[in-house]
């Protein structure tokens, strides 16, 4: 493979020195194109679509210091192909709050080696550079996280140095050495002519230094301002910069580039800190530029070759550090401050680009100026963010990840560099050599002096400023000449005006007499106006008194209706309370009666048992006495014969009788105990049944009470709504009164202003006023009639709908109350029936009868004979006891039924009263609705008297001035301004009465706010009269006050008021919502900016009648 280098073929100087010092643009991040030549037509650098900056993150393992400090790991990656990195804050919070995940293009963990990072990040940019793109790769991160290791690494060379294919690098070689090796491998495979040049810049303490220059730091030529490296804007390309004073060295192999890289790296500023033993104290930019010669495919046998230029910038940024942690002092602290300042500026640039800010602070640091095109420019950019996994560096790690995340959103627009032909390149080089020779010759012959670019720019700007000043001086001289000419012309004009002024003074003096006559006529008109105003005020007060009376009557009726509703509700509440108290009393009486009956039965039972015991004991004692007597007699008779035999028999008989008595006594006691226990159990069951029934009754009563309370609350809410409506109506009327007062004040101001302007525009008004009056009156009244009908129809519909809804709600409440009453009565009837059946059946099923039957059977078995059974007192007492129990059961049953009947009758009476009350409430609501509807229908056309007559007659008086044919300007002297003479000083005019608010004017604004939203859609939009060219209303005066702030006020005549026809007025004034709306429409008819369209008629007879009166 034959390959050659362009500098070797062009000049022998390139082969001998291998370097050349020129002024150029070293990279696309430093400038967008090195040369200022016009490109050929073969490739104009078409731009590709926008692409985001690629962001990679590399996390190293813990170093020796972090292991010794026992700092935990807070960074976790997802393997060598992962794209997420997880930062945990190490606190004992919840899992979700203690960890945060970041996403990037790829994340390299501690297991990733240098080759993996190079293949994923920089290898593709070599091909992009060979295709003519400008590319940038820079490392960003905290100090000591491996930026220099990633970019440079180990630069030692292994293998055959002379062979490109057999050149090997160590495993710790960084991106820059690997780029150089792979670049020459790619170039050797192209079989094309090429050249490669490199540059190596260092930014230390905001000063640029060329690391490839032969001078040392202690060389005085380095500090010479003439030889310092400077940054300039590229005039040929607005988005790039140029670096002057930097060397570019052509290389023929990767070995030469690696040697230059090693020499420059040795000159770089490094220092030992607590964070890193070899901390880089400066930013470096290593630039590789390739020029590839290609043949144009469009040329047919002409053999025109073009040079394709590509650049790759490899940036190694200095690490940000905390001064307290790094232990930097004095000079090192100053270095750290400048490093952090430049990195902070870089972060601000990234934030501004992400936020799409109008201002990007590139010029605040030289670092951002160097990287201007790489951030948001026309290059393909890659950022490698290096971080530490230790917890002690967690804040710096989080800051680096945040910056990298924001930088991922920056968009660049990559663009292919323009291809240059060989001829143009040679021409540029020849021109550059000639320019340098001339500069060298001039400096040797001392025909010129060496100046810096800043001084040259200042000289050029001063020369431009001098030229501008000379032009200004010339323009000022021309203006002075014109001013002199204008001054002479103005003197002539002033002389003419003075003569005219004298003539006008004479004319004005002649017209003073006419003005005095005119003033007397104005006073007469004013007197008539005063009289009319007094009449208007009297009629207004009278109408307002009537309206106030009507309003008071309506309010009283509403109060009476509300009081009646409250009374009915209170009576209903009282009846319910009485019903509840009676029910509780009945229940208490039933329980007391039952307990009393049980006690009486128990006492009777005890007395009968005692009587039975007494009878049995007496019988037994009598029998014993008889037996004793018989035995004694027998003993006396047979004592002598058989004393011992009878004594034994007697003892046996005595013992047998005694045992019989004991058994009998025990049986009686057991029977009595069983009877008592059965009676107690039956009584307990009866009491439990009674309590359950009473509880169910209480539940029903409580449900009824809750239903009635809900009804009462609903009625209270309706009453409150009515009260709130009344309050709102009063508030609206107050607002309308305020608006009317403002209108009056505006009218007064308007009258005063028209009087002051009266002498200026009276003649113009008189000429046009008489011709337009009739047409304007007709138009206004036709339009007001149509609008009035439309709004009245809408308001009628609204009120009718609202009243119908109220009536429907009232009917629903009545239905619910009646249904509740019927359900309550049915429940009580079923409950009473159940109670009757339960009580009677349970009283009849008492076990006392069974016990008594058992006792009677045992007695009958013991006695044996029928006679003894019939004469036995125990059986008779048992039968009597059974009869008493049956009679008591019947009496209690009758009492309970009577109580149930009474309760049912009371419930029926209460339900009837509730029905009556609900019917009364419904009637009251119906009457209220009918009253409102009828009152609205009757008084819908009622209109209160206003100031229309006064204004119309006042305008008619103004028309009479035209008949006089006098000019009012004759009454004034030209020596004084006109505004000092416009208002006549007459005490009569100042004594005009104030147009105060009428009393209770709120009724005119009642329905305004309510119907605004409903009627806004139905209104028609009328064009403004002032836009008519044939009808210049803006010249009219006086102006009619209009309560519409966003439209110009047309100057119209006020038509005659309908109050002139007093016989047509109704004696009752409007007081409902409809009349309030009518008053609003009436005001609109008087004060409006909307003309009336001709041809529109209404069916309302009252409006037609009023229209006829006005016409």
UniProtKB/Swiss-Prot annotation:
Residues 1-11, 1017-1038, 1057-1082 have a biased composition (Polar residues). SMART domains: KISc (SM00129). ATP binds at residues 141-148. Residues 1007-1016 have a biased composition (Basic and acidic residues). Residues 1-34, 1007-1111 are annotated as: Disordered. Gene3D superfamilies: Apolipoprotein (1.20.120.20), Kinesin motor domain (3.40.850.10). GO terms for molecular function: ATP binding; microtubule binding; microtubule motor activity; plus-end-directed microtubule motor activity. GO terms for biological process: 2-micrometer plasmid partitioning; cell division; initial mitotic spindle pole body separation; microtubule depolymerization; microtubule-based movement; mitotic sister chromatid segregation; mitotic spindle assembly; mitotic spindle elongation. It comes from the Eukaryota. It holds the Pfam family Kinesin. This is Kinesin-like protein KIP1. It comes from Saccharomyces cerevisiae (strain ATCC 204508 / S288c) (Baker's yeast).
């Amino acid at each position: 493979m034959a390959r050659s280098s362009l500098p070797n073929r062009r000049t022998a100087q390139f082969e001998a020195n291998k370097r050349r010092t020129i002024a150029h643009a070293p990279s696309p991040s430093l400038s967008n194109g090195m040369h200022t030549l016009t490109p050929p037509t073969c490739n104009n650098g078409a731009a590709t679509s926008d692409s985001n900056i690629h962001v990679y993150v590399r996390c190293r393992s813990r170093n020796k210091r972090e292991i010794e400090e026992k700092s935990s790991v807070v960074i976790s990656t997802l393997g060598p192909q992962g794209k997420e990195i997880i930062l945990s804050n190490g606190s004992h919070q919840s899992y979700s709050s203690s960890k945060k995940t970041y996403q990037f293009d790829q994340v390299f963990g501690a297991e990733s080696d240098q080759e993996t990072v190079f293949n994923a990040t920089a290898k593709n940019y070599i091909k992009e550079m060979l295709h003519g793109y400008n590319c940038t790769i820079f490392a960003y991160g905290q100090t000591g996280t491996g930026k220099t290791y990633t970019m440079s690494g180990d630069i030692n060379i292994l293998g055959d140095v002379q062979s490109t294919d057999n050149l090997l690098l160590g495993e710790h070689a960084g991106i820059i050495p690997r780029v150089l090796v792979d670049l020459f491998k790619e170039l050797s495979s192209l079989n094309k002519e090429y050249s490669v040049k490199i540059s190596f810049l260092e930014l230390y303490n905001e000063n640029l230094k060329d690391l490839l220059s032969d001078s040392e730091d202690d060389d005085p030529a380095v500090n010479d301002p003439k030889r310092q490296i400077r940054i300039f804007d590229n005039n040929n390309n607005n988005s790039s910069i140029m670096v002057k004073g930097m060397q570019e060295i052509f290389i023929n192999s990767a070995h030469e580039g690696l040697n230059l890289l090693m020499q420059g790296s040795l000159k770089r500023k490094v220092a030992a800190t607590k964070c890193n033993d070899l901390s880089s104290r400066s930013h470096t930019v290593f630039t590789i530029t390739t020029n590839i010669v290609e043949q144009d495919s469009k040329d047919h046998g002409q053999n025109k070759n073009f040079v394709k230029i590509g650049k790759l910038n490899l940036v190694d940024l200095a690490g940000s550090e905390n001064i307290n942690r790094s232990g930097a002092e004095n000079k090192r602290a100053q270095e750290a401050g400048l490093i952090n300042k430049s990195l902070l500026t870089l972060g601000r640039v990234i934030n501004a680009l992400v936020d799409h800010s109008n201002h990007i602070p590139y010029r605040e640091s030289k670092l951002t100026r160097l990287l201007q095109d790489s951030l948001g420019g026309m290059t393909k950019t890659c950022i490698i963010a290096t971080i530490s996994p230790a917890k002690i560096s967690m804040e710096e790690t989080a800051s680096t990840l945040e910056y990298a995340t924001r930088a991922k959103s920056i968009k660049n627009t990559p663009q292919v560099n323009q291809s240059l032909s060989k001829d143009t390149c040679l021409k540029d080089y020849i021109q550059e050599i000639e320019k340098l020779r001339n500069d060298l010759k001039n400096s040797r012959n001392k025909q010129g002096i060496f100046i810096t670019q800043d001084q040259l720019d200042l000289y050029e700007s001063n020369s431009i400023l001098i030229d501008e000043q000379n032009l200004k001086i010339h323009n000022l001289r021309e203006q002075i000449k014109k001013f002199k000419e204008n001054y002479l012309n103005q003197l002539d004009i002033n002389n003419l005006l003075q003569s005219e002024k004298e003539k006008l003074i004479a004319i004005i003096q002649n017209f003073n007499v006419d003005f005095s006559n005119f003033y007397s006529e104005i006073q007469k008109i004013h007197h008539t106006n005063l009289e009319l105003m007094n009449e208007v005020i009297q009629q207004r007060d009278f109408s307002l008194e009537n309206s106030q009376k009507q309003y008071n009557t309506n309010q009283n009726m509403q109060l009476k209706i509300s009081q009646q509703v409250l009374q009915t509700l209170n009576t209903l509440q009282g009846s319910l309370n009485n019903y509840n108290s009676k029910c509780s009393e009945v229940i208490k009486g039933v329980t007391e009666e039952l307990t009393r009956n049980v006690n009486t039965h128990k006492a009777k039972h005890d007395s009968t048992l005692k009587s039975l015991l007494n009878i049995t004991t007496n019988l037994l004692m009598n029998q014993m006495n008889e037996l004793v007597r018989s035995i004694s007699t027998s003993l006396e008779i047979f004592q002598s014969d058989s004393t011992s035999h009878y004594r034994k028999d007697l003892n046996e008989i005595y013992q047998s009788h005694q045992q019989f008595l004991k058994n009998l006594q025990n049986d009686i006691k057991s029977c009595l105990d069983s009877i008592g226990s059965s009676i107690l159990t039956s009584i307990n069951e009866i009491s439990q049944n009674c309590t359950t029934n009473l509880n169910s009754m209480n539940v029903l009563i409580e449900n009824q009470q809750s239903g009635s309370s809900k009804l009462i609350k609903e009625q209270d809410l309706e009453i409150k709504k009515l009260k709130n409506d009344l309050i709102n109506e009063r508030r609206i009327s107050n607002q309308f009164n305020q608006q009317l007062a403002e209108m009056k004040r505006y009218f007064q101001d308007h009258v005063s202003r028209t009087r002051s302007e009266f002498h200026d525009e009276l003649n113009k008004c008189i000429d046009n006023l008489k011709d337009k009056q009739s047409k304007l009156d007709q138009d206004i009244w036709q339009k007001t009639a149509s609008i009035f009908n439309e709004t009245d129809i809408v308001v009628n519909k609204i009120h009718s709908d609202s009243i119908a809804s109220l009536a429907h709600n009232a009917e629903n409440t009545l239905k619910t109350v009646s249904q509740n009453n019927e359900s309550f009565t049915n429940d009580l009837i079923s409950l009473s029936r159940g109670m009757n059946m339960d009580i009677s059946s349970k009283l009849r099923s008492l076990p006392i009868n069974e016990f008594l039957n058992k006792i009677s059977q045992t007695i009958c078995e013991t006695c044996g004979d029928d006679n003894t059974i019939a004469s036995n007192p125990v059986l008779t007492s048992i039968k009597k006891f059974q009869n008493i129990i049956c009679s008591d059961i019947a009496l209690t049953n009758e009492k309970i039924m009577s109580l149930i009947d009474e309760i049912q009758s009371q419930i029926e009476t209460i339900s009837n009263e509730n029905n009556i009350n609900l019917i009364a409430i419904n009637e009251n609501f119906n009457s209220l609705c009918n009253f409102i509807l009828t009152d609205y229908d009757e008084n819908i056309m009622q209109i209160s008297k206003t100031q229309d007559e006064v204004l119309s007659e006042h305008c008619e008086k103004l028309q009479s001035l035209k008949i006089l044919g006098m000019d009012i300007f004759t009454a004034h002297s030209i020596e004084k301004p006109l505004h000092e003479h416009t208002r006549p000083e007459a005490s009569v005019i100042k004594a005009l009465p104030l147009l105060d608010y009428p009393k209770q004017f709120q009724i005119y604004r009642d329905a305004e706010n309510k119907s605004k939203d409903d009627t806004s859609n139905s209104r028609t939009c009328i064009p403004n009269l002032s836009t008519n060219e044939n009808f210049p209303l803006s010249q009219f005066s006086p102006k009619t006050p209009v309560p519409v702030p966003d439209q110009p006020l047309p100057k119209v005549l006020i038509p005659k008021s309908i109050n002139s026809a007093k016989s047509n007025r109704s004696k009752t004034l409007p007081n409902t919502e409809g009349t309030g709306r009518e008053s609003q429409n009436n005001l609109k008819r008087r004060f409006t900016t909307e003309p009336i369209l001709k041809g529109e008629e209404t069916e309302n007879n009252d409006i037609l009648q009023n229209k006829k009166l006005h016409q």
